[in-house]
Amino acid sequence: MPSHGFGRESRLDSSSMERVFSLGERQHRSGLTAWILRRGEAPPHGARLGLSVGRKLGAAVRRNRIKRLLREAFRLNRHKLKPGTDLVIHPRPGCRWKGYPCAKEALLDLCRKADLLVRDE
């Protein structure tokens, strides 16, 4: 059974995010922009996530809700992603999600486009 936690090993720190921004590839989809870096090693904790949410998205309440929805979508679907992947996700101002299902679909759609999903699904 996959671990559904979102501990320190699942998060990107600022130096790791800088590395993803400089060395990773960029993808756009469903109101999201993602920088993706495929690391050589596959650590036991799998994929890692970093979020970059700008003020253009709205008030703090809206920005924090978007971050919560994206973290939850990543947390529950991390086992579907290829291990050894670092993601930095930046929601664009046009994204209008009604709730978790929309955020989940946007994240999985982006991962599908970037070929980050494990094939055995």
Residue ranges and their predicted role:
Residues 1-121:
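Positively charged, solvent-exposed patches that mediate nucleic-acid binding
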